[in-house]
Regions:
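Short, flexible/disordered intra-domain loops and linkers
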Residues: 30-38, 120-127, 189-204
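Active-site groove signature of glycoside hydrolases
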Residues: 58-68, 163-195
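Conserved structural scaffold segments of CAZyme catalytic domains across common CAZy folds
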Residues: 2-105, 109-115, 325-328, 336, ...
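Active-site-adjacent "subsite" loops/lids of carbohydrate-active enzymes
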Residues: 110-174
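Residue-level detector of anion-binding/catalytic polar loops
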Residues: 103, 177, 223
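Active-site-proximal substrate-binding groove within the catalytic cores of carbohydrate-active enzymes
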Residues: 15-21, 210-379
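Active-site cleft segment of glycoside hydrolase catalytic domains centered on the general acid/base Glu
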Residues: 74-88, 155-157, 187-213
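Active-site mouth loops of central-metabolism enzymes
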Residues: 24-42, 148-163, 308
């Protein structure tokens, strides 16, 4: 471990990632009231499909998401971090991906507790995980009479910084270089999560959390994706500490509704969600994006939920012109025949490879010029 502390890690790309997510499988299963854990045979089929059809075009990662079980086996990792996802060892998922030339990205949050409270935080003199969680005697929260749907650590508690550092060290060690951390609005202000309960730990704790996360992620060279952030004060904290931020509500059933017409056009700059659709989110936050700046994440793409070729061209082209990721959620058995060509459009994917980040001619939601984007490629 001492040698690990001295290790300098190779820099990772900070360009928007191109990847595949389990989101569609899990969301559809949840809506149907069925088991959301993806069977291993389905993992294998999707990994094979991505490797064959998307990896040659730059989609180099498979990523987990919520919905599925997330557990710690102390016999595998006594530090208390997640060892199993959907009942499968994370190291097995890493190996499956690696065998096909892919990396594994993980949906997890360094503020979440997956283990026994008696677990000792690595790098401390006997500090336990239980001492990191909410303590009514000393923690000033927004809603002390409410409970939390997640078990959060409190960043200001002694040992929290070491716990967060250990989180990124653990993931780097098993081969994970992308972490998608969710429900940040619930931690900060206890709202924005569809009525899910939360105490709300406030702005100071939220900033301290992001600071520790940024320091550890930079140290171990892990890309951070901040999900469901409030983006208060023009995203001052998120753009300072994160690599990528979500700018619109969840994909859910997808389609044109999530791309451009999910209810009336509205924008809320100081709370989650800031807007309901990709188009509004990417336009409204375009002023904070740029080369070397925070990446705008418009959430997952489900091409099988769009009706026309024009709609499918639009959802891919806008995200890439805005310098955002493409997070494919179509699966090997749900992709519509002929739709792969939209994900494989090399002319548009060249924008991602270049690190291109475009801007709309206007960021006024009611000005038609917001449909025209411009920018300069290096080549």
């Amino acid at each position: 471990d001492d040698e690990d502390e001295e290790q300098v890690y190779a820099p990772i790309s900070l360009n928007a990632p191109l990847y595949w997510s389990v989101y569609e499988y899990a969301w559809v299963a949840e809506q149907a009231g069925s088991n959301t854990n993806m069977p291993e045979v389905t993992w294998d089929a999707n990994i094979d499909w991505v490797s064959e059809n998307l990896l040659p075009y730059g989609y180099g990662m498979i990523c987990t998401d919520g919905f599925m079980s997330m557990t710690n086996d102390p016999g595998i990792d006594p530090g208390g971090y997640m060892t199993h996802y959907a009942g499968i060892k994370l190291t097995d998922l890493v190996a499956k991906c690696k065998a096909k030339g892919l990396k594994l990205g993980v949906y997890d949050n360094p503020l979440w507790v997956h283990c026994s409270y008696e677990t000792v935080v690595k790098g401390t003199e006997g500090i336990t995980v239980g001492s990191l969680v909410y303590n009514s005697a000393k923690d000033d929260v927004l809603y002390p009479d409410k409970g939390d749907v997640f078990t959060w650590i409190v960043p200001s508690h002694k040992g929290a910084k070491e716990f967060i550092d250990g989180f990124f060290k653990y993931y780097k060690k098993i081969g994970v270089e992308f972490i998608r951390m969710d429900f940040l609005c619930l931690f900060e202000t206890a709202d924005g999560a569809g009525g899910m309960p939360g105490r709300g730990y406030g702005r100071e704790e939220y900033e301290l959390a992001l600071k520790y996360i940024s320091e550890a992620a930079t140290k171990y060279q892990v890309f951070t994706s901040l999900v469901m952030p409030n983006l208060k004060n023009d995203a001052e904290l998120e753009k300072k500490y994160g690599n990528m931020i979500r700018v619109d509500a969840d994909t859910m059933k997808g389609g044109w509704q999530h791309f451009a017409s999910n209810g009336p056009t509205w924008f809320n700059p100081n709370g989650w969600p800031s807007t309901s659709n990709m188009f509004t989110g990417l336009i409204s936050w375009s002023h904070i994006a740029g080369r070397g700046k925070v990446v705008l994440d418009a959430d997952f793409t489900r091409l099988n939920t769009f009706d026309t070729e024009g709609e499918k061209q639009s959802v891919i082209s806008l995200q890439l012109m805005a310098g955002g990721p493409i997070a494919v959620a179509d699966q090997y058995n749900t992709i519509v025949s002929g739709d792969l060509k939209f994900y494989q459009n090399e002319e548009l994917l060249a924008l991602n490879k270049d690190g291109f980040v475009g801007k709309p001619l206007s960021d006024d939601l009611w000005n038609a010029k917001n449909q025209i984007w411009y920018g300069q490629m290096f080549d």
